[in-house]
Amino acid sequence: MELRDSIRSFPTAPGVYLMRDATGTILYVGKARNLRQRVSNYFGATDGRPQVRFLMARVTSIEFTITDTEKEALLLENTLIKQHQPRYNLNLKDDKTFFSLRIDLTERFPRFTVVRKVSRDGARYFGPYASASAAREVLRQLQRMFPLRHYPLKTCLNRSRPCLYHQIGQCSAPCHNLITAEEYNLLVEGAVLFLEGKNKDLVSGFRQRMKEAAEGLHYEEAARWRDLLKAIDTTLEHQKMVSQGGDSDILGLAGNEDSLAIAVLFVRGGSLSGSTVLHGSGGLDTSDTLATFIQYYYGNERFIPDELLLPLSLDAGQSLEEWLSELKGKKVRLQQPKRGDKLNLVNLATRNAQAALAEKSATRQGIERTLAELQQKLALPRLPRRIECYDISTLQGRHSVGSGVAFLDGLPDKERYRRYRIRESQGQDDFGMLQEVFARRFSPERIEQWGLPDLVVVDGGIGQLNSTLSVLAELGLSERPAVVSLAKSRVKGDGKDIHVERTEERVFLPGRRNPVRLRQDSAPLKLLAAIRDEAHRFAIGYHRRLRDRETLRSALREIPGVGPKLERLLLTRFGSLEGIQNATVEELATVAGVSQELARLIKA
């Protein structure tokens, strides 16, 4: 029976379908309100999208799973896409970490902290912010207006007197009873209203408090409310309002045959607070693509706003609304604006997506030219899309480490960066260290997982190249990657001339005595140098971390009163020696057995 004929027996119920090729590999996962109708559409002559043609030319079988509701189909589809990562489904690249402000209102004297992830823990989260510095700047602004505590409560209660922030007016010192719990909670409510964009409620409430304090002849309290109102007014002057309060995310979508871009504008409290763009590939239908994006993006412990403004309507819109509302714990709306300010915001998000896609396409074309030129200049058997570079870092044979970095299509592929702690080679045995690193990278298990790179770059001249080739030969690989070495430029002459000249960087190839000389300003050489320098940076960073860790560990044990047990307690509390080093005296003093005096010795 032909595949087209088998579709006639599909049910008309909601569910999920999986398309497989002749090897059984899942090519695409989709959901449907009506399985038979949805899958039949792929065989229609009217669908001329290239992605659909490419997909259907490879599909040899289609399976389905019936679900009770469309929402269940939505959730199952999301699970299967994450599990199998099919080639023709949306594949997003999101290397950006967002930050939020968190406050637990059930805590005694609540305080705001900057966090990386939004957890379902009952606390309030505000954001997201594109960087830690942006989140901290908002927090500093908030603390100037609302003098809430800065430190963990245990640290505050262990202090003998109020902290420095109290002295400069940025902490109300609740730990020393310099403010009542009721007054402190009013400050917390004000800070929350400010972050929610409910500035009219905030200002009117504080003005009423100031008036009541003045009428009751509590002039110091009235002055505090007055100063607080001035700080709020000053801040609000610099905020541009784009909507009538509330939190919204505005999505814009742009795509071509090869890739797509989705822009997200963040409106918090009625003000545009930031934006991000995610790039990806795959996806057959714009409605399905946007629905998949929403599941990926907001299901990954993100802040969920009150509403999402979309450039198009979604077939699974109602199911997505229910799912988002369950995650948030309150109603979330999906809207496709038709007119007015909200439509203008969606158009702005779409223009951001289009601009990002155009920039990405131009960059991609430049990278393709660079890789093609590199292949031609170095006589490589194939286009060097995946390039790996390895470096060794050691100091007189101590703390020896290796590093491996990977570039994919001219850009860092940090998921495949690896650090290697040298365990077997001793002393200054660079050959042995490289052999140990390559034995781990090019083990059968790792080759099966990652495959071979198109090109391996090593730092050095012909000697380093020959050593690398010998190591690879000893590993007995059935297939070997292409290998070149890149020798750094050197200062010409004795270096005493005021006009310093340098030799060219040279690329050594196997079986060739003289190096290839690339123009110093050429894109291929810049790419090779960037990869080599990144491997060196990565190795040096790891080497220094190990060296500093041992130095700090030795220094800790030399402090009177710090033994192995207390060292373990400190490591448990702060996670690492770096964490101990970065902790404040007050935070160190929260560890059992650490007095204020000992904490100061540790910080000294």
Swiss-Prot record:
Matching InterPro entries: GIY-YIG_endonuc (IPR000305), GIY-YIG_endonuc_sf (IPR035901), GIY-YIG_UvrC_Cho (IPR047296), RuvA_2-like (IPR010994), UVR_dom (IPR001943), UVR_dom_sf (IPR036876), UvrABC_protein_C (IPR050066), UvrC (IPR004791)
GO biological process: nucleotide-excision repair; SOS response
One Gene Ontology CC term in the entry: cytoplasm
Presence of the UniProt keyword Cytoplasm in the record: yes
Gene3D superfamilies: 5' to 3' exonuclease, C-terminal subdomain, GIY-YIG endonuclease, UVR domain, UvrC, RNAse H endonuclease domain
One GO MF term attached to the UniProt entry: DNA binding
Domain (GIY-YIG) ranges: 12-90
Residue ranges annotated for the UVR domain, each copy included: 200-235
Keywords on record: Cytoplasm, DNA damage, DNA excision, DNA repair, Excision nuclease, SOS response
Compartmental location: Cytoplasm
PANTHER family to which the protein is assigned, alphabetical: UVRABC SYSTEM PROTEIN C (PTHR30562:SF1), UVRC/OXIDOREDUCTASE (PTHR30562)
Quaternary structure (record): Interacts with UvrB in an incision complex.
Family recorded in the similarity comment: Belongs to the UvrC family.
Its job: The UvrABC repair system catalyzes the recognition and processing of DNA lesions. UvrC both incises the 5' and 3' sides of the lesion. The N-terminal half is responsible for the 3' incision and the C-terminal half is responsible for the 5' incision.
Listed name of the protein: UvrABC system protein C
Native source species: Trichlorobacter lovleyi (strain ATCC BAA-1151 / DSM 17278 / SZ)
The gene coding this protein: uvrC
